[in-house]
């Protein structure tokens, strides 16, 4: 094979990979659009009247996750299953965002942390890498940390809306998250930096709870702060 033939062959490989990446980008753009729609819907809970609409907003968000499933099913077909991490950077951030959105819905519904397995059911993907397109553990953890930041904001807006018990519940939840993350030996630099922000979320929520307790807005909050 001549030198020119070698490079022609290599160009064929490069062009084929570029085609794959372009197909992936198209699907990811659709995922990003749906994620924005879900986020816009859920952001309404931060508004005064939004607290009364939480069940309706969560139900609507779950309907949008049906569209997410469709897009992810399409994405799986765009590349060989064994090359997941070769193209992972294309969908990593939107997948983390979708984990956060799923976790936010579950928290608003039950005030509990969604499991990684439950997220994969909501998204229609696999929990284990051996089964193909899956939810990477670090992507799950990143989404959970985004949730913590969102909940710290919600604690402040809850007070504005006159919901004085919600910040206490959020404080308990975020402190449990913090305790959980302390058990992990995080090697990923990006994940470690995001985890560093969790302590500020914890502090922000605790300040809200403390402010409520000293102002005597509700006995539940005051009693909890005294116990601390």
UniProtKB/Swiss-Prot annotation:
InterPro entries assigned: Translin, Translin_C, Translin_fam, Translin_N, Translin_sf
GO MF, one annotated term: mRNA binding
Modified residues (N6-acetyllysine): 187, 199
Cell compartment(s), UniProt: Cytoplasm; Nucleus
Enzyme nomenclature, EC number: 3.1.-.-
Single Gene Ontology BP annotation: siRNA processing
GO cellular component: cytoplasm; cytosol; endoplasmic reticulum; endoribonuclease complex; male germ cell nucleus; nucleoplasm; nucleus
Keywords: Acetylation, Cytoplasm, DNA-binding, Endonuclease, Hydrolase, Nuclease, Nucleus, Phosphoprotein, RNA-binding
Coiled-coil annotated spans: none
Keyword Acetylation: yes
Function: DNA-binding protein that specifically recognizes consensus sequences at the breakpoint junctions in chromosomal translocations, mostly involving immunoglobulin (Ig)/T-cell receptor gene segments. Seems to recognize single-stranded DNA ends generated by staggered breaks occurring at recombination hot spots. Exhibits both single-stranded and double-stranded endoribonuclease activity. May act as an activator of RNA-induced silencing complex (RISC) by facilitating endonucleolytic cleavage of the siRNA passenger strand.
Protein family membership: Belongs to the translin family.
Listed name of the protein: Translin
Gene behind the chain: TSN
């Amino acid at each position: 094979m001549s030198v020119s033939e070698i490079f022609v062959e290599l160009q064929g490989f490069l062009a084929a990979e570029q085609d794959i990446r372009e197909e992936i980008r198209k699907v990811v753009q659709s995922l990003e659009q749906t994620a924005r729609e879900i986020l816009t819907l859920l952001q309404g809970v931060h508004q005064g009247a939004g607290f009364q609409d939480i069940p309706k907003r969560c139900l609507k968000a779950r309907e949008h996750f049906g569209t997410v499933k469709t897009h992810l099913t399409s994405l799986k077909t765009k590349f060989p299953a064994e090359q997941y991490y070769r193209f992972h950077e294309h969908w990593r951030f939107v997948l983390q965002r979708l984990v956060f959105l799923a976790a936010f819905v579950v928290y608003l519904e039950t005030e509990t942390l969604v499991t990684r397995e439950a997220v994969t059911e909501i998204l229609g993907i696999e929990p284990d890498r051996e089964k193909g397109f899956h939810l990477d553990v670090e992507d799950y953890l990143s989404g959970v940390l985004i949730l913590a930041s969102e909940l710290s904001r919600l604690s402040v807006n809850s007070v504005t809306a006159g919901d004085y018990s919600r910040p206490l519940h959020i404080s308990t939840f975020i402190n449990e998250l913090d305790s959980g993350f302390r058990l992990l030996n995080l090697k990923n630099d990006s994940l470690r930096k995001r985890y560093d922000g969790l302590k500020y979320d914890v502090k922000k929520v605790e300040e809200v709870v403390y402010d409520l307790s000293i102002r005597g807005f509700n006995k539940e909050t005051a009693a909890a702060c005294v116990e601390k």
